[in-house]
Amino acid sequence: MEFYQLWIEGSTHYYHSLDNALRMGELILREMFSDDAEQGEVIDYWWDRWEAYEGDRKIMCITKEMMED
C-alpha cells in the first residue's frame, strides 16, 4: 500500500492521497508567506516539486512511501 509523507520542519503527517497532502501543504504555505508575490512563487514550486524552501532552508516536502500489507 502506498502513502504520502508530508514533512513540515520536524513534524510528519501521512496521507493516502497525493492531492490531499499537496493541498494541506498549500494551506500551510499560504499562512507562512503572507506576501502575495512570494506566496505565489512558493506555491507554484510546491505543486511542481513537492518541496518548499524559505531562503536556502527546506521547510516542507512530500515523499512517496510504501507499506507492507
Residue ranges of each PLM-predicted region?
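A short, sequence-level motif marking secondary-structure junctions
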Residues: 1, 16-23, 64-69
